[in-house]
């Protein structure tokens, strides 16, 4: 099986009317794939691309009006296309000459083509000499020169065109062995996802591919979840703690007790709705807002340990198999034993990944030795006697055990939605959330590279949409509870001096465009951005029968996202960890 190779882009530069399009069409032959310039950008100075062969793309750009320098810096191979001797336009403008000399200085292969006008075939030798002298005077004499006749594209045999084709293929094959493999960095994309993106592109073009990736990103954690927080007092206090809000914040529960079920969508995930449900004398009026007949899960809030009468009040609000859990606001007691067992197992598995007991603990089963010691009568009694729902004490640091318990008790889709909707309340919760974000990071990375391709400008920013990455990083920073307001809220809850927890963070915020660009440049490395812009779409073509998934845009975006997420996770673990003794 041949080793994967990189994609090579040869850019044809020349004045308008110099014959670039006809030359590329002749080199590509019939039935070629073309990357069209986006609507409304035909005169914007953006190259169009054609797939000439597996891993070889030919682009053309008229200079003027476009400035050749920035695009020439993106090409793996540069071809100067000079017009015939007729006309008043100079065949080699100063800008073209400067771009070509800069390419040679960078080590970019350079070729030159002089297209003859109709009737100039008899003067081919003279045209070759004149063009060679022109190139020598411009410091470009090292470039191989080709002088095809005017009717070369329509003839079956054209030695000069064939010679140019051989040189192009030879140069491309040499470069393909040096460039990163086309699919390098896309290992996280499964074959099904990659095929779906390509199918969307082939069906509806770049916009369809963008829509497919964007829709998949929006579906992450999009399951509907209606979570009731019911009680006679302090219902709003528990709701605000779960959402990471202070009283008076937008979206927080009002100070007055609710008189009927009231919805509070999670700020970042409106598909997750927390409902305050008053019980007893506080429910004084019929519900005005339509609400579920049965909630997906319910949290019973009581001042102390809930009684059987308290549980009886809320059982009709959920289906028999729905999660039911309690919170006591006096802070007394401990987390349920199964949650404590799971935390111990998780800590052990963090230190020793081979500890097979962690799975049993995770399910709340307990040690097998305890099970073996029980008598048949004990086992029968456990089956007949229904255990009461677990109860969590409310502490200043939040309710981390409650969130973990709910995520285990809910169906997978709703558990994922809840994980992404609520801010983490412990280092372990932050690690779980970061793992979920990391698993889906390929979607915003791919969206950033495709979105940039829809509105290209030369340079690394073309291959990767900086604004989209900036927004994604800012969203993740909020999701992990690293906004200054969230950090200050935790400092107040723990009775710490202002700024104590903020000093533990290292990830810069707010996320600026300059910060994202610096990270992209640092990740890509100096001198490796050549071809990034022109190859950003190349992953949509088959290469050698395999998926060609190249483009520095995706690899840089994915690398920057994962690196930043690791830094944010370290900050979240530091902020959510126990305070130091001297604080």
From Swiss-Prot:
Q: Which cysteines are joined by disulfide bonds?
A: 152-158
Q: Where is this region: Disordered?
A: 322-373
Give the GO cellular component terms, alphabetically.
autophagosome; lysosome
A GO molecular-function annotation: protein-macromolecule adaptor activity
Q: Does the keyword Protein transport apply?
A: no
Record-linked PROSITE patterns: G_IRG
Q: Where is this motif: LIR 1?
A: 186-189
- Please report the stretch or stretches of sequence annotated as the IRG-type G domain: 223-409
Chief location of this protein within or outside the cell: other
Q: What happens when the gene is disrupted?
A: Increased CD8(+) T-cell response.
Q: Where in the cell is it found?
A: Lysosome; Cytoplasmic vesicle, Autophagosome
Q: Where is the composition biased (Acidic residues)?
A: 332-341
Coiled-coil ranges (or none): 155-179
Q: Which UniProt keywords apply?
A: Autophagy, Coiled coil, Cytoplasmic vesicle, Disulfide bond, Isopeptide bond, Lysosome, Phosphoprotein
List the InterPro entries hit by this protein, alphabetically: G_IRG_dom (IPR030385), IRGQ (IPR040070)
In this UniProt entry, the residues modified to Phosphothreonine are 203
Query: Where can the motif LIR 2 be found?
Result: 381-384
Q: Name one GO biological process term.
A: protein quality control for misfolded or incompletely synthesized proteins
The keyword Manganese is assigned to this record: no
Q: What does this protein do?
A: Autophagy receptor that specifically promotes clearance of misfolded MHC class I molecules by targeting them to the lysosome for degradation. Acts as a molecular adapter that specifically recognizes and binds (1) misfolded MHC class I molecules following their ubiquitination, as well as (2) autophagy-related proteins, promoting the recruitment of misfolded MHC class I molecules to autophagy machinery for degradation.
UniProt note: domains: The LIR motifs (LC3-interacting region) are required for the interaction with ATG8 family proteins GABARAPL2 and MAP1LC3B/LC3B.
Family assignment from sequence similarity: Belongs to the TRAFAC class dynamin-like GTPase superfamily. IRG family.
Describe the protein's quaternary organization and the partners it interacts with: Interacts (via LIR motif 1) with GABARAPL2. Interacts (via LIR motif 2) with MAP1LC3B/LC3B.
Q: What is this protein called?
A: Immunity-related GTPase family Q protein
In its UniProt entry, the species of origin is given as Mus musculus (Mouse)
């Amino acid at each position: 099986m041949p080793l994967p190779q990189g994609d090579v882009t040869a850019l044809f530069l020349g004045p308008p009317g110099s014959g670039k399009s006809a030359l590329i069409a002749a080199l590509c032959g019939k039935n070629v794939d073309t990357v069209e310039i986006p609507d409304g950008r035909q005169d914007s100075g953006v190259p169009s691309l054609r797939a000439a062969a597996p891993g070889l793309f030919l682009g053309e750009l008229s200079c003027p009006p476009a400035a050749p320098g920035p695009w020439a810096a993106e090409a793996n191979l540069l071809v100067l296309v000079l017009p015939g001797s007729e006309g008043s336009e100079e065949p080699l403008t100063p800008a073209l000459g400067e771009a070509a000399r800069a390419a040679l200085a960078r080590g970019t292969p350079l070729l030159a083509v002089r297209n003859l006008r109709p009737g100039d075939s008899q003067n081919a030798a003279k045209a070759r000499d004149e063009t060679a002298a022109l190139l020598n005077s411009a410091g470009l004499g090292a470039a191989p020169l080709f002088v095809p006749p005017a009717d070369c594209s329509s003839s079956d045999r054209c030695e000069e065109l064939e010679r140019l084709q051989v040189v192009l293929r030879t140069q491309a094959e040499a470069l393909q062995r040096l460039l990163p493999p086309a699919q390098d960095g896309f290992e996280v994309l499964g074959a099904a996802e990659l095929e779906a993106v390509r199918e969307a592109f082939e069906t509806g073009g770049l916009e369809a591919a963008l829509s497919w990736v964007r829709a998949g990103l929006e579906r992450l954690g999009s399951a509907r979840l209606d979570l009731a927080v019911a009680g006679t007092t302090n219902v709003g206090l528990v709701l605000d703690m779960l959402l990471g809000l202070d009283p008076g914040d937008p979206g927080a529960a009002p100070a007055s007790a609710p008189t009927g079920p009231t919805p509070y969508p999670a700020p970042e995930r409106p598909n997750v709705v927390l409902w305050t449900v008053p019980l007893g004398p506080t429910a004084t009026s019929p519900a005005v807002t339509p609400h579920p007949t049965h909630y997906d899960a319910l949290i019973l809030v009581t001042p102390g340990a809930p009684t059987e009468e308290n549980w009886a009040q809320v059982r009709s609000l959920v289906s028999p198999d729905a999660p039911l859990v309690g919170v006591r606001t006096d802070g007394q007691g401990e987390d349920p034993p199964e949650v404590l067992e799971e935390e111990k197992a998780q800590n052990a598995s963090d230190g020793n990944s081979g500890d097979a007991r962690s799975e049993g603990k995770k399910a709340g089963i307990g040690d097998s030795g305890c099970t073996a010691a029980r008598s048949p009568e004990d086992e029968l009694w456990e089956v007949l006697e229904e255990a009461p729902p677990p109860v969590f004490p409310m502490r200043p640091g939040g309710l981390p055990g409650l969130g973990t318990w709910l995520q285990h008790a809910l169906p997978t889709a709703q558990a994922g939605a809840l994980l992404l909707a609520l801010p983490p309340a412990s280092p372990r919760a932050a690690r779980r959330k970061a793992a979920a974000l990391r698993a889906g990071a390929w979607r915003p990375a791919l969206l950033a590279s495709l979105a940039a391709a829809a509105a290209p400008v030369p340079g690394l920013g073309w291959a990767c949409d900086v604004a989209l990455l900036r927004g994604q990083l800012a969203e993740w920073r909020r999701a992990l509870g690293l906004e200054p307001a969230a950090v200050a809220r935790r400092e107040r809850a723990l009775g710490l001096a202002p700024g104590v927890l903020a000093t533990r963070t290292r990830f810069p915020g707010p996320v600026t465009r300059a910060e994202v660009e610096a990270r992209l440049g640092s990740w890509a490395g100096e001198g490796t951005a050549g071809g990034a812009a022109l190859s950003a779409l190349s992953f949509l073509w088959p290469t050698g029968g395999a998926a060609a998934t190249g483009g520095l845009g995706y690899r840089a975006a994915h690398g920057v996202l994962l690196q930043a997420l690791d830094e944010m996770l370290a900050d979240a673990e530091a902020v959510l960890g126990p305070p130091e003794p001297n604080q």
